[in-house]
Amino acid sequence: MKIQPSNKRALLKAALGTIESDMVITNVQLVNVITGEIYPADVFVYDGMIAHVEYKEPGKELSKAKQVVDGEGRYLIPGFIDAHEHIESSMMTPRNFAKGVIPNGTTTVITDPHEIANVCGLEGVRYMHESSEGLPMRQLIDIPSCVPAVPGLENAGAEFLVKEIEELSSLERVIGLAEVMDFLAVINGEDRMMDIIDFMDKKGLYLQGHAPYVSGRMLSAYLCGGPNTCHETRDSDEALEKIRNGMFVDARDSSITKNVKEVYEGVKGIKFFDHLCFCTDDREADDILHVGHLNDVVRAAISYGMDPVTAIKSATYNTAREIHIENLGAIAPGYVADMLLVDSLEELKPAKVFFGGQLVAENGQLVAEIEDRSYPLEQKNTMFVKELTVEDFKIKAPVQEGTVKVNAMEYKDLLLSSTLQTVLELPVKDGCVQLTDDTLKYVAVVNRHEGYDTIGLGIVKGFGTTCGALASTVSHDSHNLTIVYDTPENALKAAHALIACGGGMSAVKDGELLHVLELPLAGLISLKPAKELAKDSQKMKEANRALGLVDMENPLLRIVTLALPVIPNVKMSDLGMVDVLKKELIPLFA
């Protein structure tokens, strides 16, 4: 696939120098991600495309361009391409997201709108598509493949089969199938998943993968099934095995999970890094504003010892190859003119950002205009929760008094989203299971989608909170109302706060509502601009810390993967506790 110029014949003339180019960037050190070289060059741009790169005699033909941009000796690198991103996880609309990431040098993102798809179905994906039109960046869309993530083990607000995939495939800027996270369905050749893959193969679009800890013959089967990328690679051995087997590894640095160091440790001894890319996956507004976006991920890789040019190539050229766009991600004739001027290859703070040859950001500030628009979905209520009482949050035991053995989920590490199954012997009082210490909490996953009234209850150990109730409708991927709590009374108050505002996050301690982060769009997204949202997010983080989450860099997102039944080994859903690898529900009592 190629991004086509609007007038190829005119571009040819600009390349030959027989007509003026729109712009030339001169006095730069060009970072050539194809050869690995750095050298002085002039880059001529015509109609959003690179027409000519002059490196033999830079400075000689500047008169052949209408505008001359002095790079002041800076490095000129391609615009960054995020290999895998859920814009909803920034809690911003696509337009506000663009305002946040463009000054950081991100000119293209491959976005998977499966968060909003799980809540609003086709209407949600169309919203993400329509609201990202006409932006000074490229938001390319992968069609959500697993809505819900694992059918039969959770209830979402929609279900995508081949019919829905086919309908979305005709949208402009759709380039592939989003992360095929039901990896067992691929490995086992299940009809629902394979029908979707077969359809996308016929369309000639790429298949994005999701294969945590998948290894050996299971990995071979997954690759033979079609998906060829993975952003869920979490350790060094896994990274090396996947790249050796021809898989693209999208090393992730999100607000939740950071895997770049482990991935690089695994592959630093190989000769070719062509199958290594970078992604942010889930990065919230506060981090984007104060830390950065993909430029921060590349900085991290360099700090772990990766060669800067190789790291930049992984964030540009390699990613374009992964998504099958031939003329994106490098600075060469016929390529799209997405470029950054940076003072340092280690710091990667763009002095200027060009998108399609147009200056869109300068010195950390957006200079392109992004018009504010409103859409009907932004006013739609998605909280269809039945009337709740304290009784809904009590775990009723099979005995009135005594003890019972409970199947529970356990976190071994505050920094990891993976969990283990454990069996706890807990006391029973008045027919209800009691907690014995502050490492234990109750969990409720309350279905919030129209037509359901299911509530999954369980026990979690090592979640990190020591008191109170933490509630969120940001709860991958079905985004049901998930609550971790110490008492049913606190849980009810936290739930009511979110039902009242249309969704978001809330924290309650000793019956007092500490803070509510309102996310009225699908219970996932704020309508506030990035700076306002970041301030609100900081208040929510402080509320989380007041409940005991003090040892996490970003406590806001601790809860969001607790109900994601594709991350091993056990997770909760509105139907109960799920054995991820066996794809079956686990009884509450052992």
Model-predicted regions and their roles:
Residues M1-A41, V45-Y46, I102-N104, L289-G305, ...:
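Active-site microenvironment of metallo-dependent hydrolases
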Residues Y55, P113-I116, P144-C146, D182, ...:
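Short, ordered loop/turn segments at secondary-structure junctions
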Residues I77-H84, T111-H114, D142, A178, ...:
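Active-site neighborhood of phospho(di)ester-bond hydrolases with catalytic His/Asp-centered motifs
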